[in-house]
Amino acid sequence: MDAILRQMRDGILRDACKLVLVFSNNPKAKGLETAKNAGIPTYCISSQGKNREDFDREVINFLAPLKIDYIILAGYMRLLSPLFIRTYQKRIINIHPADTGAFQGVGAYEWAFKNKLKKTYVTVHYVDEGMDTGDIIEQHELDISEMTTLGEIEKAGLVLEHKMFSEVLKKLFENEQ
């Protein structure tokens, strides 16, 4: 969230889009406080104790009047229901720290480290009804052959994620205009 807000304030996303809301299902999410401090409207609906479809229906009803063009998942760690995905088909974008054909879900950098991979990937993709299986928008390679700790891989991966996500979003939004 920090990286996207910085790019919207001072960087390549400044004139490319307007952030209308930061939403979370977790009232303690750091992104809510970050957005609030930046003057961005925030909203939270707790998902605790709710089934996925009922929760997503509640979120859809909240978002509907906002006429949102895209939903950008940045640290949102809850699987979306088929109802939500169909409602916002090809308008939900996620970033995943791996080749989505090789590894889906959480722990991608740890997986690359444990498997002694020479390279891994960062992938920006549309969200579909599977986990990290949507159409790839863009994918960049991350050379990890000289890295000896998981921390090094995570740090390098995060740098690439922050740079790449903003660049991909800018291209996507410019193609919409």
What annotation goes with each model-predicted range?
Residues 18-21, 41-43, 91:
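Conserved beta-strand segments of alpha/beta enzyme cores
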Residues 5, 24-42, 66, 70:
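Non-catalytic terminal and connector segments of soluble metabolic enzymes
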Residues 57-66:
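Short, well-structured alpha-helical segments in soluble
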Residues 24-25, 48, 52, 66-82:
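N-terminal glycine-rich "phosphate-gripper" loop used for MgATP/nucleotide binding
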Residues 1-30:
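N-terminal Rossmann-like dinucleotide-binding module
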